[in-house]
Regions:
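N-terminal "first-domain core" detector
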Residues: 1-45
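Beta-strand-rich solenoidal segments
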Residues: 43-46, 50-172
């Protein structure tokens, strides 16, 4: 019996699925380490770190990120999302007549940071330092900002909850 690309892909999918299920069921949706947020003038700085989304994906931010604040009203949330980026272009072996066609050979795990008018985790239950994982892949809230008397403020109570999720991981 010969091992095929399909066999290897099935094995990878199985192990990734098991790891995601472990993350969802045991850890929930949370910041695992780092990812502190600092507000300085018109910019937000996000520290390196790792988080788990509701699907169980591991989101790694390897270095400090600087973002400009958006033009928003009243309140807004800084969000972190898991994304997969196709890389490694190679000539496609399955093209008829078109010898210049390419396809991707690798998937790189990455992240995106964004802004949202609402908290993507607001409908989730908070229990023992984590949001209950719903199984869907959607953004994770890192910080809440409000505008008070024309000044942008970073919500300390929201930060304490995010930090509590980070601090309780593995304490159990």
């Amino acid at each position: 019996m010969m091992l095929t690309a399909q066999d290897l892909q099935a094995e990878q999918a199985y192990h990734i699925g098991k790891r995601q299920m472990h993350n969802r069921c045991l850890h929930g949706c949370r910041v695992a380490c780092g990812l502190g947020v600092t507000l300085r003038r018109k910019y937000v700085y996000i520290d390196p770190g790792m988080a788990l989304d509701c699907h169980g994906n591991e989101i790694v931010v390897p270095e400090t990120v600087k973002m400009s604040l958006p033009q928003r009203k009243r309140r807004f949330f800084l969000t972190l999302s898991y994304v997969e980026v196709e890389t490694g272009r190679v000539p496609s072996p399955f093209t008829e007549g078109d010898h210049h066609r390419e396809e991707f050979s690798r998937i790189q795990e990455a992240y995106t940071l964004g802004w949202s008018a609402r908290d993507p985790l607001s409908a989730h239950d908070w229990h023992l330092g984590a949001w209950a994982a719903c199984g869907q892949s959607h953004p994770l809230s890192l910080a809440k900002f409000t505008i008070q008397r024309g000044q942008i403020k970073l919500s300390r109570s929201f930060q304490e909850r995010v930090n509590a999720s980070r601090d309780t991981l593995g304490s159990g």
